[in-house]
């Protein structure tokens, strides 16, 4: 039964010998639907640990169960009748956007009720005894769950952030992008107690891509969300834990092992640590941009953002693959897309197939040698001012949203001084740290090992890495091999 909407609805009917459940059962998270028996019956409850044993020890049966779990979640999200969580809030509210973004990243089905446009809002707020000033709020069915929750509060309420089960793990991975998820799959499948600490949701930058067309094995392309979701299920099958909404604030080496300090004061110790925190896009440096972050200025282009600008003009800044993928995706939603690049050659940093796609899309206008100088509007973004850095020509473009995909800033400020970084903050590894004063062993560092023995880095956060999904996945898998080598030395 689906009890998330106004009235309960039947999702499906199971008979004798069939099984219930979806991907939430792998982590012990609450189910999205409930069950009602029509008569006397006998039901067997299978715990997450027992379920994993079945999946791993009986692969034929495990394949059937996993495929059913994945399909059921997809059917719920695509049914058009499943409400899921209800988020009530303004399209101009940063917190409303943050909540929607967090739910989307974690593949939690939800319905957004726009404070300015949805006719149900007044009725629902009255039922909950709330006013517009109390929004954003999150509800399930007729039950109010939370008022403007933090990501951590939301994760704990939904059961996707659970207490850590161990004090010491063989492998702690910080970051659930492609590198971190690959390490989780390989580490857990090879018998290492593995936990992935993720501050928002799985997938990283890649998880926000609407179509990756050059990833091996997917000739028709794959969304970043689908790739991340399948990796999470795969890691969970082997026993890796992934408590989202877990922010690491500090790394210390008080004892023999690295100790990670979390936002809530909790600590977790690692025999080996993998830093896979990736890199964020650099914040746009244009006049007025601060007031529009999360309500007109965005750093990803998913369905969440596209809802805000359907049928309007939008602009994108950036010349890499992420910008190209976003431009093509948004062109199907927006009236017009302005693609702004500082240089003259789109081929410099973008794959040829994307350049060709952009050139063949009639509602994408490429603005070469151009930079964004100003963003303007009152409560919401109305226009941007751009300047040609060759001619000095200034244009004002009416836009409902600006998407920025420029630069890369590694998330590494939480690291201790023992972990050497380059001038831009990316983590040094391998031969680059062999002469570091923090490197004490007589052997040379492993290729992905940092300046502290037993601490590794992989993916976009690593200095000198290739910023591609396939490369990050390869580095995450490779790091696990070095983890095994290090553990042999202990």
Locations of the language-model features?
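A short beta-strand-loop-beta hairpin characteristic of the jelly-roll/cupin
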Residues: 1-9
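Short, structured interface segments
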Residues: 49-79, 139-164
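Short hydrophobic beta-strand segments
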Residues: 84-90, 313-316
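Beta1-alpha1 glycine-rich phosphate/pyrophosphate-binding loop at the start
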Residues: 87, 91-119, 128, 135, ...
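FAD-binding core/adjacent interface of flavoenzyme oxidoreductases
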Residues: 117, 122-174, 189-190, 207-208, ...
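Rossmann-like dinucleotide/flavin-binding elements
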Residues: 164-202, 285, 291-293, 299-352, ...
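A Rossmann-like FAD-binding core segment of flavoenzymes
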Residues: 228-270, 275, 331-442, 485-489
């Amino acid at each position: 039964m689906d009890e998330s909407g106004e009235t309960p609805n039947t999702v499906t009917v199971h008979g004798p010998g069939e099984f219930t459940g979806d991907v939430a059962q792998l982590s012990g998270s609450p189910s999205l639907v409930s069950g009602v028996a029509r008569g006397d019956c006998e039901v067997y409850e299978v715990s997450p640990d027992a379920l994993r044993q079945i999946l791993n020890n009986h692969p034929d049966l495990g394949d059937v169960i996993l495929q059913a779990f994945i399909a059921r979640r997809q059917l719920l999200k695509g049914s058009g009748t499943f409400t899921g969580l209800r988020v009530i809030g303004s399209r101009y509210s940063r917190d409303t956007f943050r909540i929607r973004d967090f739910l989307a990243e974690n593949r939690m089905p939800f319905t957004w009720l726009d404070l300015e446009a949805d006719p149900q809002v007044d009725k629902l707020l009255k039922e909950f005894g709330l006013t517009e000033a109390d929004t954003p709020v999150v509800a399930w069915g007729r039950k109010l769950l939370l008022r403007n929750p933090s990501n951590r509060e939301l994760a704990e309420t939904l059961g996707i952030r659970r207490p850590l089960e161990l004090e010491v793990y063989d492998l702690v991975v910080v970051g659930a992008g492609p590198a971190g998820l690959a390490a989780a799959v390989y580490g857990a499948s090879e018998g290492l107690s593995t936990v992935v600490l993720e501050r928002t949701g799985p997938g990283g930058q890649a998880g926000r891509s609407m179509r990756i067309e050059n990833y091996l094995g997917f000739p028709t392309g794959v969304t970043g969300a689908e790739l991340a979701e399948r990796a999470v299920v795969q890691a969970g099958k082997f026993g890796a834990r992934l408590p989202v909404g877990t922010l690491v604030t500090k790394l210390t080496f008080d004892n023999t092992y690295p100790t990670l300090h979390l936002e809530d004061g909790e600590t977790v110790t690692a025999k080996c640590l993998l830093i896979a925190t990736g890199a964020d896009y650099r914040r746009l440096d244009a006049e007025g941009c601060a007031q529009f972050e999360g309500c007109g200025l965005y750093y990803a282009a998913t369905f969440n953002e596209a809802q805000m600008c359907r049928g309007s003009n939008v602009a994108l800044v950036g010349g890499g693959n992420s910008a190209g993928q976003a431009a093509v995706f948004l062109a199907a939603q927006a009236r017009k897309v302005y693609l702004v690049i500082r240089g003259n050659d789109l081929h410099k940093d973008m794959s040829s197939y994307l350049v060709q796609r952009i050139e063949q899309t009639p509602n994408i206008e490429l603005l070469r040698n151009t930079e964004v100088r100003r963003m303007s509007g009152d409560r919401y973004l109305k226009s941007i001012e751009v300047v040609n850095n060759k001619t000095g020509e200034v244009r004002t473009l009416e836009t409902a949203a600006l998407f920025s995909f420029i630069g890369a800033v590694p998330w590494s400020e939480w690291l201790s001084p023992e972990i050497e970084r380059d001038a831009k903050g990316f983590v040094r590894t391998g031969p680059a740290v062999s002469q570091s004063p923090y490197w004490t062993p007589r052997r040379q560092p492993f290729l992905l090992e940092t300046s502290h023995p037993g601490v590794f880095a992989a993916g976009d956060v690593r200095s000198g890495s290739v910023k591609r999904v396939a490369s990050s996945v390869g580095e995450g898998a490779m790091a696990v091999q070095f983890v095994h080598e290090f553990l042999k030395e202990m």
